[in-house]
Regions:
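Sec/Tat signal peptide C-region and signal peptidase I cleavage site
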Residues: 15-21
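Residues at structural and domain junctions
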Residues: 5, 21, 89-90
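Short N-terminal segments immediately surrounding and downstream of signal-peptide cleavage
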Residues: 21-38
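Generic cytosolic/nucleocytoplasmic N-terminal low-complexity/intrinsically disordered segments
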Residues: 1-2, 61
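Short, solvent-exposed mixed-charge patches
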Residues: 20, 149-150
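Sec-dependent N-terminal signal peptides
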Residues: 3-15
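A cross-family detector of function-defining hotspots
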Residues: 33-142
């Protein structure tokens, strides 16, 4: 399930970034809603169906990477796109909610139980690598999960 979710996440982000300008706002809204639902379902979050979110989108171009950010009460999910082809190369999930973090950590533990050779800070998915990092801000503590090229 976690591999399917991550594949869906990458595919959705890639498709959203390749949409034509007149279609982008509507498509991004649908894609973001799908990502929010998928991410919630992945960790067993019942609130995912009704979760409120907002989207920030800055297209790639002129040697500037593109960015799409989905903000919810539980997390901030950032997609970074290569400026040459607008393909998503990194996903950063900053978790704000203790419940969501607990559920996501449980998902990580299941992965590491099934893959005992991996260290406890990474999870592999195809040619991508999900890396765990601790960050903090003045108002709250985040745990970030970053998907990058291997």
């Amino acid at each position: 399930m976690k591999k399917l979710f991550l594949f869906t996440l990458m595919l959705t982000a890639a498709l959203a970034m390749q949409a034509q300008a007149s279609y982008i706002a509507e498509q991004l809204g649908r894609d973001a809603h799908h990502i929010v639902q998928s991410l919630g379902a992945c960790v067993g979050n019942e609130r995912a169906e009704s979760q409120q979110f907002d989207i920030t989108y800055m297209p790639a171009g002129n040697n500037v990477e593109g960015v799409m950010i989905i903000n919810t009460a539980d997390y901030r999910c950032t997609f970074k796109m290569d400026p040459r082809d607008e393909i998503c190369y990194e996903i950063i999930l900053d978790v704000r909610s203790a419940d969501f973090l607990r559920d996501f950590n449980r998902l990580f533990q299941v992965y590491h139980t099934e893959n005992p050779d991996s260290d406890d800070k990474t999870m592999h998915f195809g040619d991508k690598l999900i890396r765990v990092r601790e960050t903090s801000s003045t108002t709250s503590r985040f745990r970030s999960f970053t998907m990058t090229e291997k």
